[in-house]
């Protein structure tokens, strides 16, 4: 059973503090390019995840448009920035395997369930979720402060009011400024936290500290990275959120590459790559269904034989782990 100490600080034996590199704008754009390379090399799972969030974005817009919650459409959409680093944990695992020259299957993303840092990752995810909830609460307070108990009841009158009145523009300006503060906080504490926890089994506190040290050492690069993420999300949201099907996975892979540039590697403390999931895990009906679906997508894309989850031993047959073509 994982101790509370492990969740917050990592293994007691771990004494190496992650060393921060100095990076610049070129590193940000290089990380984005490498993220694109990862996406095109491994498109199946990212497209599946991206489409899920595109649909989620449309659903959020619909829920806020046909009720008395249109004013929360922007804060909810901005939540992608706040919780995105946690959601992309499976994409980090794919990029981690690819950089080591391993063949990557979509179902390999489920091996994060066996990561020794999983409790710390979940705890950090809850922290980001709390920041997101605080942002939504602040947005509601700003709206009530400006519009009182009788706001426009429908979406069209609300949009007309926002774009043509003083209180509407005040809502936009104040809302954007407050949202920027929440986004800056989330970026500063999580810019490399999740990849670092996955890679080295660090606890919540040292991972948060490492992100803050990266931010202090490279304020311009981190600010540029945040701007790239925000701009990409805005562009991805414009065509009815469908652009997020590409933007979110690319940003997930690029975040892993950014982490590699911002933190020096320490092979002695890196967590070994996991093999196939234990049969007890794949016997879980929900996980088994996800496994089969992801494996089927790989079969359709690559033409390889799907993983056999019904082997007599109960253990999924291991795929031969082959280096990528051109891998060192």
What are these regions (language model features)?
Residues 1-328:
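Hydrophobic alpha-helical membrane segments
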């Amino acid at each position: 059973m994982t101790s509370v100490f492990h969740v917050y600080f990592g293994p007691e034996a771990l004494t190496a503090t992650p060393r921060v590199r100095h990076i610049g704008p070129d590193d940000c754009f290089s990380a984005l390019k490498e993220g694109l390379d990862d996406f095109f090399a491994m498109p199946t799972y990212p497209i599946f995840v991206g489409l899920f969030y595109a649909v989620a974005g449309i659903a959020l817009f619909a829920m806020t448009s046909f009720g008395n919650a249109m004013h929360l459409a922007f804060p909810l959409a901005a939540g992608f920035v706040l919780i995105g680093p946690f959601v992309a944990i499976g994409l980090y695992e794919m990029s981690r395997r690819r950089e080591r020259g391993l063949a990557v299957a979509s179902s390999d993303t489920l091996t994060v369930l066996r990561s020794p840092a999983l409790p710390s990752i979940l705890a950090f995810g809850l922290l980001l979720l709390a920041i997101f909830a605080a942002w939504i609460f602040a947005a509601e307070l700003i709206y009530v402060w400006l519009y009182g108990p009788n706001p426009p009841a429908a979406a069209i009158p609300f949009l007309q009011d926002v774009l043509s009145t003083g209180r509407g523009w005040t809502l936009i300006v104040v809302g954007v400024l407050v949202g920027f503060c929440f986004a800056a906080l989330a970026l500063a504490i999580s810019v490399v936290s999740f990849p670092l926890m996955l890679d080295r089994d660090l606890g919540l506190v040292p991972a948060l500290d490492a992100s803050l040290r990266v931010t202090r050492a490279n304020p311009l690069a981190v600010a540029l990275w945040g701007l790239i993420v925000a701009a990409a999300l805005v562009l991805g949201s414009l065509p009815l959120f469908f652009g997020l099907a590409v933007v979110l996975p690319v940003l997930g892979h690029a975040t892993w590459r950014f982490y590699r540039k911002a933190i020096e590697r320490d092979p002695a403390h890196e967590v070994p790559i996991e093999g196939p999931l234990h049969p007890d895990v794949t016997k879980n009906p929900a996980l088994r269904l996800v496994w089969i679906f992801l494996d089927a997508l790989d079969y359709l894309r690559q033409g390889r034989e799907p993983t056999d989850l019904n082997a007599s031993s109960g253990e999924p047959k291991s795929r031969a782990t082959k280096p990528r073509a051109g891998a060192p």
